[in-house]
């Protein structure tokens, strides 16, 4: 079991509650219950719910179910705009400060979990003490040869260099740029800032086991269609057609909403056999929703939990008939201790779900494994030996079809060379 709260936040007197979890698990419902109990207001952290209108396909919590609780950073971005994480950070910080100023508790809720990473984890500040780069430094940073940049980083900060593949050009370049601009090794900076939060933050993870969750998600898609989701998708398509968008332009912005791209072939009628069944589009929407939920769980376990050193409380929303006991009352008890500055008496996770946090602990240990493994058998397209970072990826490489094929080829070549030598000796 993971122990110990996350230390080092910048403002211990100001509280923030974060509710993480997959789509359709009940985050909005829980946020209303906590807001009512603790005089809170909700801040949306879902990248699709920031867009105006289309409340059904973006799954905005219905106004009539919000119990008068104010919601911030929601329903304010035009469809023509792309919404970036730096804008979310600005808007979310403004909302948090406003809510705190009025003596209330901000409750951050949403499915775009990387927003939480951007908001709560302190990042490297290169501007406060930024140095002017020399011509030589600029030449190195602008080099198109990954080896030049990587080898320079190895000399300047070997610890941070081990965390990146030599061909990970952009990240290696960024680390070297930080070193040049601050005069400080990025590895030292990251170690100092790794567990710093901007506020005293309680992380709650609302979780449901996959099978019942997926059934609820399928049912939700059916319910959305009954409530008018198809009309909203057609509304989006009308805007899409009027502005002459193409499918290739639908990788960003409002077009990422689940439902639009799944129904686009049906709306355009453009397929190989010119026939698209509405039922197939509905099934694709359900499939993509389930896939999205899987990615969200993976992100929480592999990114969020390691970032906050396991300082998170898991709530079981698997059985909705037990919602009040397993989710609502447990969340209220945890939040009450947190807000009152008392030690939290509740366990991090119910016994049946402890393994989820244990896996997060394993991930944290694995994240510290930055050993470089060089394969003497396999080479990249540029002729260099393949490099794997960390034991996990080394084992994956060793078990890959590519490695096994190269190993067999080398063995056959070695056997052939041995045969030639033996034959030559026999003849002589």
Curated annotation (Swiss-Prot):
Main enzyme class: transferase
Renumbered residue ranges of the record's region Core aggregation region: 199-207
Organism: Saccharomyces cerevisiae (strain ATCC 204508 / S288c) (Baker's yeast)
GO cellular component: cytosol; mitochondrion; nucleolus; nucleus
Name this protein carries in UniProt: tRNA dimethylallyltransferase
Family membership noted in the UniProt record: Belongs to the IPP transferase family.
Interaction with isopentenylpyrophosphate transferase: region residues: 210-232
ZnF (Matrin-type) residues: 373-409
Comment, domains: The core aggregation region, although lacking the prion-typical Gln/Asn (Q/N)-rich domain, is required for the formation of the amyloid-like fibrillar aggregates.
GO molecular function: ATP binding; tRNA binding; tRNA dimethylallyltransferase activity; zinc ion binding
Binding residues for dimethylallyl diphosphate: 23-28
Stated role: Catalyzes the transfer of a dimethylallyl group onto the adenine at position 37 in the anticodon loop on a specific subset of tRNAs both in the cytosol and the mitochondrion, leading to the formation of N6-(dimethylallyl)adenosine (i(6)A). This modification optimizes the codon:anticodon fit in the ribosome and promotes translational fidelity. Competes with the farnesyl pyrophosphate synthase ERG20 for the common substrate dimethylallyl diphosphate (DMAPP).
Sites annotated Interaction with substrate tRNA: 112, 193
GO biological process: tRNA modification
Assigned keywords, A-Z: Amyloid, ATP-binding, Cytoplasm, Metal-binding, Mitochondrion, Nucleotide-binding, Nucleus, Prion, Transferase, tRNA processing, Zinc, Zinc-finger
Region (Interaction with substrate tRNA) location: 46-49, 170-174, 256-258, 284-302
InterPro entries xref list: Dimethylallyltransferase, IPP_transferase_euk, IPT, P-loop_NTPase
EC number: 2.5.1.75
Catalytic function, reaction form: adenosine(37) in tRNA + dimethylallyl diphosphate = N(6)-dimethylallyladenosine(37) in tRNA + diphosphate
Miscellaneous information on this protein: [MOD+] is the prion form of MOD5. [MOD+] is the result of a conformational change of the cellular MOD5 protein that becomes self-propagating and infectious. This conformational change generates a form of MOD5 that assembles into amyloid-like fibrillar aggregates. [MOD+]-aggregates sequester soluble MOD5, resulting in decreased levels of (i(6)A)-modified tRNAs and higher ergosterol levels, due to less competition for ERG20, which uses the same substrate DMAPP than MOD5. [MOD+] can be cured by GdnHCl and by deletion of the molecular chaperone HSP104, which is required for [MOD+] propagation. Present with 2020 molecules/cell in log phase SD medium.
Binding site residues for Zn(2+): 375, 378, 397, 403
SUPFAM superfamilies: P-loop containing nucleoside triphosphate hydrolases
Residues annotated as binding ATP: 21-28
Superkingdom: Eukaryota
